[in-house]
Amino acid sequence: MEQASTMAEPRGPVDHGVQIRFITEPVGNAEMDTLRRGGRRPAKDARANTYGVAVRVQGIAGQPFVVLNSGEQGSDSFGVQIKGTNNRGPPGALSSDSELPESTYSHAKEFPARSQGSMSDEELGAHWNGRLLRSQSQASLKGPAPVSPSTRSTSLLQLAPEVASPGSTIDTAPLSSVDSLINKFDSRQGGQARGRTGRRMRTLPPEQRKRSQSLDNRLPRDTLDEREHQFPTHWTPSTKRDSHMGNSKQSSQNQGPLGGFSCSRQTQDWVLQSFEEPRGRAWDPGMLQFKSTPDLLRDQQETAPPGSVDHVKATIYSILREGSSETETSVRRKVNLVLEQMQPLVMTSGSAKGLTGQSELSQKVEELQQKLDEEVKKRPKLESSRLGLERQLQEKAEECSQLQELLERRKGEAQQSTKELQNMKLLVDQSERVRCGLEAQVKELQDKLKQAQEPEPAKEALMKDLLEARELLEEVLEGKQRMEEHLRLRERELTALKGALKEEVASRDQEVEHVRQQCQRDAEQLRRSIQDATQDHAALEVERQKMSTLVRELQKELEETSEETGHWQSMFQKNKDELRATKQELLQLRMEKEEIEEELGEKIEVLQRELGQARAGAADTRQMEELKKELCQTQKELKELKEEQQNQEVAGRHRERELEKQLKVEADRGQGLEQQNLQLQKTLQQLRQDCEEASKAQVAAEAEVAVLGQRRAAVEVTLRETQEENDEFRRRILGLEQQLKEARGLAEGGEVAEARLRDKVQRLEAEKQRLEEALNAAQEEEGSLAAAKRALEARLEEAQRGLARLGQEQLALNRALEEEGKQREALRRSKAELEEQKRLLDKTVCQLNKELEQIGNDSKQALQQLQAQLEDYKEKARREVADAQRQAKEWATEAEKNSGGLSRLQDETQRLRQALQASQADRDTARLDKELLAQRLQGLEQEAENKKRSQDDRARQLKGLEEKVSRLEAELDEERSTVELLTERVTRGRDQVDQLRSELMQERSARQDLECDKISLERQNKDLKSRLASSEGFQKPSASLSQLESQNQELQERLQAEEREKTVLQSTNRKLERRVKELSIQIDDERQHVNDQKDQLSLRVKALKRQVDEAEEEIERLDGLRKKAQRELEEQHEVNEQLQARIKTLEKDSWRKASRSAAESAQREGLSSDEEFDSVYDPSSIASLLTESNLQTSSC
């Protein structure tokens, strides 16, 4: 198409304040032909015709008023437009309809002026006060540069220069009717400047005062296209209202779906208003009722010839009026807008390509700006998270150092316990040596008893004692066998522990190497990740949540470890106290041993004295030789005992060496652990350095946080492993303590056996002394009878006192037994309470398992639903992509079919390409939304995995609780066994008391026998005295004297025997007193042990309660996580609904574009190439354009 005029300058903004159109009467067909061929109309006919004035004024909310006035006799119609800036007044400053002039239009016919090059939403005309020459073209007006937004720019009539007549100028006299109309419109605003501030009064320079070119002298299309290529800006409406209002520069640079058609400022303003104005405005009947004049377009339809602009307007008006309830003004506005939009269809493909390139560049600039803003927002958050992680790493390093100190302390305590074990083993060896010596002495006494076979009561007593000694020896041998078996078991356990320790050390070394490799790999990944791109924000949030949960768990674990360390410290203090008590007991035993050795030395000295006396007074040498032989045998036995003692010492040293080796192995393992801790500290330092480097690199902040999380997880794993190793050391220390306790028990049993053997030895020694004294009894004198009598009386008194003491001690023992029974009942009650607590714990564990199973099922169902939704979305997206591709293929085929046509088909294909790009952009947004959904799903899956991990942790905790319960049961069994041992000891004590009673009865019977012997001796003494008195008077033979001497010797022997029995009774009384003291000490120790066990059980019960509370808190936390997951699922459903709505809108838009393109292509195929203008303004293409959803009327 040919253009009306050319412009030297670039086009400026068009004012929508006032538009004036001169309407003339129609002319004949000949004149139309001349006009179409570019000819001029005669001046006479132009002056003879009448004309009307159509004035458009901006009204309420951008809706125009149409006022028609009759004109004067003059020239034909000229299109005139008064231009100004596009500043709109506020929507509230509106005027009523009465202030506008009424329509006085009386003509029903007008000539349709042909305006191919018009760029406004109405035809433009020019009014001249004087004689105007007709050029069949409208003057293309140009507004000045924009001024300040507070004042509107005035209008200026500026005509394009005419090449044919360079000397002619244009009269720019003001228009009175237009000025009066403008003044009346501006006077209604009440002092507020609305629309234009006044008419432009700028005078044109002489080089611009030229007439417009006629149709014969128009520029060719090439120059017009070049001028249109010089348009600097192309506007694209934004989809958001606030973005357009906030940033006009970005909106001016973008290009929307109508950017390919925008060739004038008025079209741009219409598109802007279509995106800004609400949809309800067009349907408000109160807003659409405007005052209008008779229908001009209907009159034009009656007279306009086919193919002209008025004919096109009439067809558009008829199409829009059919079946619509809108007012005439809105329909006319739409008609003008449709004409405006159809003009850019003639644009060349080069300009469209430039527009598309600019739109793509603007989109890229916006995307880059958004990315920069997001990175700037993310940077402070990442820096704060990095600082928090560094603090946490420092805290973990401090905790590692504390754990190392605890390990060193516990190693020292283990060494002390091993030393004490060695001491206990030495004591046990010494007791075994003493036992062997006593056995040798017993054998000697047995040999002597076999040699002496005289049937005397003393020998019978000796036989009984020997039988008892044999029983005791058998018991001691059985205990020895048990001890040996126990020691063998311990040695086997030690060997097994050695193998297990070696395996654990090897596995630990492998794990350390694996951790080192992982650390190196992680360091390399860190260095690589510093150079990589940033990750998504959703993944960051998920990682932060994980880090927060991990920090909370670590804090809980730290609290638990602190509590456990306090508990273990208290246990160690108790063990230290017990070790101190055992040391004191050992010192007491040593003192008693020294006392016993002193007593033995005194007895040996007494024996030596008696032997000397026996040597002096013995008549035979045979007895002396026998005594010498016995002494030699005793010396040999002493040597054998010394050799056995040396052998036992060698065995003890060997055991000590083995224990030292075990301690060295454990120390080496502790050193390995320390080295591992040092390596962990080094890795932590490396992590800190990496963190500092990552803080310098702002771009890789998110990747750094992720890698730090992994590193921290590895450190936490290593810390947990160290804690487990510490627990293993604690268990080993407990095992050593148990071994100590068992050794103490064995030592106590050995001491008891030693005491019994000592008693038996003392008895046998006393009997030996009595036999030796019996040999020398014949040599003692009668004078010792009185002293023996007195001594017997004193001894009887002492025996009575000892019996009273024994009765008191028996009462005390009965009371102690009653107290022990009460303690046993209390233990039974505590046992029942513990069983009830165990039952409650089992119930809570079952409940926790059920709740965990329910949570797992819920999470699985939610995951399945999300997966199904994802699959649905994927299928929908695939279908949409396939539909879009099919439509694109159809459009491409249509474009290929119509490629041989005219240039308008190229424009259409370009527009279709732009629509395809827009649809591809929509698809990209849909894909982005799908990716966001996928990332959300990944986050939910990660949360589900976290829940599973928490469930596994709960299961582990439950297993730990079950193990603790089993330990408590084992400890209860141990308590039962200790109670049974106590009962056995009590029964033994009772048996010993019974034995003491029987011994007392024997002593009483012996005392009675002695009293009887005393009485008989007194009688015999009296008889002897009487006989002496009678023998003084006469001499008796020597036979009677010899008899008397023999009787005297017998009496002396009896007295010596009685003295010996007294000494034996005193020794037995002393032994009984010592035994009672030992029993009382044992009972006190057992009471303390029972109390300590009660305290331990109470502490464990408290710990179990605390663990139950923690389990309940964990359950509450899991419920909170489940609720959070449900909320996120609901949010995901909402997002899905929004996406579905968006997809529906995209489908509608694509369907509309496809139908429009199909209609336009069908209409273009039926058109001829000769009638470009008619084909462009065809009613079918107009109808396809009017079907767009975003088509709305713009203000003037």
Curated annotation (Swiss-Prot):
Residue numbers spanned by region Head:
7-354
Coiled-coil residues are 355-1150
Name the segments for region: Interaction with TJP1/ZO1: 54-67
The segment annotated Tail runs over 1155-1196
Q: What is its main location?
A: other
> What positions does the record give for the motif labelled ZIM?
48-62
Q: Per its database record, what is this protein's job?
A: Probably plays a role in the formation and regulation of the tight junction (TJ) paracellular permeability barrier.
Instruction: List compositional bias (Polar residues) regions by residue number.
Output: 95-105, 245-256
Quote the protein name from its UniProt record. Answer: Cingulin
Q: Which family does it belong to?
A: Belongs to the cingulin family.
Q: In what ranges is there compositional bias, type Basic and acidic residues? A: 218-231, 884-897, 1051-1061
Q: Which UniProt keywords apply?
A: Acetylation, Cell junction, Coiled coil, Phosphoprotein, Tight junction
User: Which organism encodes this protein?
Assistant: Canis lupus familiaris (Dog)
Per UniProt, what is one GO molecular function of this protein? Answer: microtubule binding
